[in-house]
Amino acid sequence: MGKNEARRSALAPDHGTVVCDPLRRLNRMHATPEESIRIVAAQKKKAQDEYGAASITILEGLEAVRKRPGMYIGSTGERGLHHLIWEVVDNAVDEAMAGYATTVNVVLLEDGGVEVADDGRGIPVATHASGIPTVDVVMTQLHAGGKFDSDAYAISGGLHGVGVSVVNALSTRLEVEIKRDGYEWSQVYEKSEPLGLKQGAPTKKTGSTVRFWADPAVFETTEYDFETVARRLQEMAFLNKGLTINLTDERVTQDEVVDEVVSDVAEAPKSASERAAESTAPHKVKSRTFHYPGGLVDFVKHINRTKNAIHSSIVDFSGKGTGHEVEIAMQWNAGYSESVHTFANTINTHEGGTHEEGFRSALTSVVNKYAKDRKLLKDKDPNLTGDDIREGLAAVISVKVSEPQFEGQTKTKLGNTEVKSFVQKVCNEQLTHWFEANPTDSKVVVNKAVSSAQARIAARKARELVRRKSATDIGGLPGKLADCRSTDPRKSELYVVEGDSAGGSAKSGRDSMFQAILPLRGKIINVEKARIDRVLKNTEVQAIITALGTGIHDEFDIGKLRYHKIVLMADADVDGQHISTLLLTLLFRFMRPLIENGHVFLAQPPLYKLKWQRSDPEFAYSDRERDGLLEAGLKAGKKINKEDGIQRYKGLGEMDAKELWETTMDPSVRVLRQVTLDDAAAADELFSILMGEDVDARRSFITRNAKDVRFLDV
C-alpha cells in the first residue's frame, strides 16, 4: 500500500467513532440563503410553451460551483487550477496575519494532490448553530467562515469569501486534519460530501492540514507548475514579514533534482499513518523555503537585484488608521521602466486601485514641491509628471483593509474610495520626511526625473514626427504593412514577421480577408536599455506602434486596437527567439494591456518536414513529434525519401507560401501560444534579466534553465 493509499485508509470513516454524521442534516444544510438560482433554458421550440416553474433550477449548496466553476475561480484552465491552492494558502496566511501562525507548509503530492498545513489555531470543530460541525460549514457552504467575523479576523484575503468550500466543490476528494481543543480531528469529503468527523488522539498542538485532489472532470489539466506555485508563495512570504513558507514537490524523482535537494523532509506535514507507511531511508525531493525578516524591504531588494539602484537606502514606511493599514517600500534604479506592485490584504491587485492612486498622487506632489523648494526646478519650469518621477521606480504597496471592495470577480482592482485619501495622507507625511532627511539621495531622484522629463519632451516630438510621417502614407499606416480587407478588429489578425523573405511568403500565403502582415526589415531596438525618445526613433518600433493604433504609455487606448490577434512569427532558432523576446519586451514595457487582455500570441512554425515517397509530406513541431511521425509512418509501410527525407527548417524563409499557410497560419491547423501575464513582478524580473545590463544575472539564468525544454520555445 502506497503512502497516500495508507493515509486515505486511515482517514476512512469508522462510523463507530463518528462524532457527528452530517449526512442526516443535508436538507437543513442546503436550505441556506446562499442558494444560487439559475434559469435552465428550454429547447427553443418549446421555450414559449414550457417556460414555467419547472424551468427554474435551484442549484443547492456546492452544486452551483460545479455548474459554473468559472464564476468562482476565473477559469478551468491552469490559472483556475492553481487558484485552488491560493484559496487554501490564503486561509493559512490569514492565521499568520492574525498573529496565530508562523509556518505554512505546501506539498505537491506525488499522486497529483496538494497538501497545505499551518500551525495556527485550527479550524473549529464544535457543533455550529446550524447543527453540524463547524468544519463542515466551512467546507460545504459558500460565504461561510471566520473572515466574516471581525472578532476572528480583522483582516483576511480569499476569493470573495467563498474560499475553501469552492476547493471542496471542485475536488474529487478533500481531507482535513485538525489539532484543536486538546485533540486531533479528521474529516474526509468525497465529491464534496462529508463522511463523518472523527476524534483522534489527545494533543497540545494546534493547526490545520488540508489535502485535496482537483477533479479532472472539471479542469482542463490537473498538473501544477512548481514555479507558478513558488512565485506566489514567495510573494506571500514577502508580504508577511517573518512568516516561513515551505514548498515541497514530491512529484520530482531523485534523478530530476539538480540543486534544490533536501534529504530530510521533516518540515513537510505528515500524518502518523503516512510516516509508518514510508521508508525511513532519506529521499530527495525538490523544495524551497521562503522567509523574509525584512518583508517589503526584502521584496524591493529582490525586484532591484538585477538593476542598478541610484541611491543606497530603501524608503520604507507604514501607517495605521481606523480599519486601514498601509506599508510601502521603494527605491529608484537607473532603468527606464517603473515596477510598482500593489496588494490589498495580500491579494495581488494587478490593475491597481485606490491605494495606488493615493500613492501616485502623493509622490507626484511631494517631489514637485521638494524640487521647487530646493531650486532643482525653476519656478517657470512646468511640473514633473507622475511618469517622469516614477521612471526607474521599484515599489511595493501593501494595504490591509477591514472591509475591502474589489472590482471584478478575481480581485484585481481595489475600489474602496476612503483608501485613496488614507494612503495619500500617510505618503505625503512620510515621503516629505524622507526627502528632507536625505538631501543627497533626494537630489539624485529629482535629477533623474528631470532627465526623464527632457526625454519625454523629445519623445513627444518623435511621436509627432511619427504621426506626420504616417499621415503621408495611405490611410496613415506604415508602407510596409500589407493590411487585411476586414475592418472588424475582432476578426482581424496582425502577423509581425521577422525578415523580408518570410514576410513575402506570409503575404502570398495569408488569407487577406482577415490577416495583415507587417515584416520587420531591421533589428528592433532593445527597449530595456533605451529611453523612450531613442525608442521612438527606431523605424521598426514606429511601424509597430502605428500599425496597432493604440498609442503607448499614458496615451494608450485599447479601444483603438486595429487587430485583436497580434501574432509574433519568427524563426524557430536562437536568433528568432531573440527577436521574439525584443518584441515582447516592447509590448510589455510600452503596451502592457495588450498582453494583459490576451491579444498577443507566438506562432509555432514547424521544425521539421518529413518527405515520404508517394505520400504527402508531414510537419513536426518538436523532436519528439518528428520521432513519433517517423515511427508511425514506417510502421504503416511508408518509405521516407533517402536523400532529403527529413528537412530541418533553419528559418521561415525556407518555407514557401503554401507551406507557411498550411503549417503556421491556417486557423484550422496552426498552433498559437497565447502570452499571458500572471505575475507582473516575475515578468518584470525576467525581462530585466534577459534584456538588461547585468551579464552575470543573464548567464546564471541561462545556466539554471538550460535543461528546461520550456525555455527553448521562448
From Swiss-Prot:
Binds two Mg(2+) per subunit. The magnesium ions form salt bridges with both the protein and the DNA. Can also accept other divalent metal cations, such as Mn(2+) or Ca(2+). It is an enzyme of class 5 (isomerase). Its cofactor is Mg(2+); Mn(2+); Ca(2+). It is found in: Cytoplasm. Signal peptide: none annotated. PROSITE patterns: TOPOISOMERASE_II, TOPRIM. GO terms for biological process: DNA topological change; DNA-templated DNA replication. One of its GO terms (cellular component) is chromosome. Keywords: ATP-binding, Cytoplasm, DNA-binding, Isomerase, Magnesium, Metal-binding, Nucleotide-binding, Topoisomerase. It catalyses: ATP-dependent breakage, passage and rejoining of double-stranded DNA. The keyword 4Fe-4S does not apply. Its EC number is 5.6.2.2. Belongs to the type II topoisomerase GyrB family. This is DNA gyrase subunit B.
